[in-house]
UniProtKB/Swiss-Prot annotation:
SUPFAM superfamilies attached to this UniProt entry: beta-beta-alpha zinc fingers
Region (Interaction with CTNNA2) location: 371-455
Cellular compartment(s): Nucleus
Subunit structure: Interacts with CTNNA2.
Protein known as: Zinc finger protein 639
Function: Binds DNA and may function as a transcriptional repressor.
Basic residues: bias regions: 1-14
Length: 485
């Protein structure tokens, strides 16, 4: 902008409507009613009044005489019958220029400086009510906004030096001015919301996102709907938000419990379903080998094989044709092939299987050394127990063993053989474990069960019976029972 703009004249009948754009109102220049600086527009719907002062007793008061306006010819208005126009006193409040139009009360002003308009408003709220004195000379303030910078109207007889002096004498914009409730002191809506004018086009822009609008009401509604604060109901641990405080309290109780920890990484959660989902999403492709007895997953077959060795310590594999038992499933498979191959062929021929023979029957069951499973080749059924696969093949895929014992897993081709086998179990009786729900028809099976299942919890074993105890004192007390008998 040019430092010395071209000066133009403009006359008006209502000089009190105008003041400069810098926030400082000027006194009308004589009777012409032209202000000394930029034009202002009044935001009030009321037309500001102009005070008429009669020239009475002016000659006796030199201070008043100096304040009288001059006419165009340089003479002062001294005649009593003359009346002249002057604008009312001006107050500057929060960077707004206000014209006084009516009678009001006298207001006390403090000189405390504030860092921002928001702090000024807060300071005025915290101040105690001031003492008000009624006066007819102090009018009510009406808020006035400066108009656009497009107006470039200046009054004549104002040099650039005088403009610079007046700018230097401008009062600080951050002075706190405490006004009473009767005055029109309102914090603008822009000070209550994080809003800015984006550019010269006049769009209101939200500071929290990219939203902008031509109308302030739209932006205000956007802030309320999209950026409503919910910090009071947010969990500090997982940052989850809740609509009410009661829901937040119930959620916080979950974090006080022991979390579920992923065995493959450092993931922790208080919700078991979240842990299951985490394993399925993150570790499912990395852990393809699992144990069918305890559902533990492994990333390699060697780890799974070592895990199976722990299970095999407390289990015995029984032959379905004889009393042979072993702890090695591969040994049981070799035993059936080597010792009972002829019997399998005979049973297969009796059932009319024709040319299927030994190879056809044995090919239905294979042993997977990598995964340590017995696998049915017909449907893929697998188990670590050879007895289970034999039972499955006998029932589902052949007619060799239509009758299978539920206690030991042995199969029989006829009902007569099956009933004889059941009588053998009844004659021996059923042996029950007193420490768990295990039952068997053979005493040796019960002894093996006690040694492998309960030896860790009950290490002290009675040599006279099958009783086991957790400490030596209980065992010594039990041995006294045998001595008395």
């Amino acid at each position: 902008m040019n430092e010395y703009p071209k000066k133009r004249k403009r006359k008006t009948l209502h000089p009190s409507r105008y003041s400069d754009s810098s926030g400082i109102s000027r006194i009308a220049d004589g009777v012409s009613g032209i202000f000394s600086d930029h034009c202002y527009s009044v935001c009030s719907m009321r037309q500001p009044d102009l005070k008429y002062f009669d020239n009475k007793d002016d000659d006796s008061d030199p201070e008043t005489a100096n304040d009288l306006p001059k006419f165009a010819d340089g003479t002062k208005a001294r005649n009593r019958n003359q009346s002249y126009l002057v604008p009312s006193p001006v107050l500057r409040i929060l960077d707004h220029t206000v014209f006084s139009t009516e009678k009001s009360t006298e207001v006390e002003i403090c000189d405390e400086e504030c860092a921002s308009p928001e702090s000024v408003h807060q300071h005025t709220q915290e101040e105690s009510p001031i003492e008000v004195h009624t006066s007819e000379d102090v009018p009510i303030a009406v808020e006035v906004h400066a108009i656009s910078e497009d107006y470039d109207i200046e009054a004549e007889n104002n040099s650039s030096e005088s403009l610079q002096d007046q700018a230097d004498e401008e009062p600080p914009a951050k002075l706190c001015k405490i006004l009473d409730k009767g005055q029109a002191l309102n914090v603008t809506a822009q000070q209550k919301w994080p809003l800015l004018r984006a550019n010269s086009s006049g769009l209101y822009k939200c500071e929290l996102c990219e939203f902008n609008s031509k109308y302030f009401s739209d932006l205000k509604q956007h802030v309320i709907l999209k950026h409503k604060r919910t910090d009071s109901n947010v969990c500090r641990v997982c940052k989850e938000s809740f609509s009410t405080n009661m829901l937040l309290i119930e959620h916080a109780k979950l974090h006080e419990e022991d979390p579920y920890i992923c065995k493959y990484c450092d993931y922790k959660t208080v919700i078991f379903e979240n842990l299951s989902q985490h394993i399925a999403d993150t570790h499912f492709s990395d852990h393809l080998y699992w144990c069918e007895q305890c559902d533990v997953q492994f990333s390699s077959s060697s780890e799974l094989y070592l895990h199976f060795q722990e299970h095999s310590r407390d289990e015995q594999y029984l032959c379905q044709f004889c009393e042979h038992e072993t702890g090695d499933p591969e040994d049981l498979h070799s035993h059936v092939v080597n010792e009972h191959a002829r019997r399998l062929i005979e049973l297969s021929d009796k059932c009319g299987s024709g040319g299927h023979g030994q190879c056809s029957l044995l090919s239905k069951i294979t042993f997977d050394k990598c995964k340590n499973f017995f696998v049915c080749q017909v449907c893929g059924f697998r188990s670590r127990l050879h007895t289970n696969v034999n039972r499955h093949v006998a029932i589902e895929h052949t007619k060799i063993f239509p009758h299978v014992c539920d206690d030991c897993g042995k199969g029989f081709s006829s009902m007569l053989e099956y009933c004889k086998h059941l009588n053998s179990h009844l004659s021996e009786g059923i042996y029950l474990c007193q420490y768990c729900e295990y039952s068997t028809g053979q005493i040796d099976d019960l002894k093996i069960h006690l040694d492998f299942k309960h030896s860790a919890d009950l290490p002290h074993k009675c040599s006279e019976c099958l009783m086991r105890f957790g400490n030596e004192r209980d065992l010594l007390g039990h041995l006294q029972v045998h001595e008395t008998t």
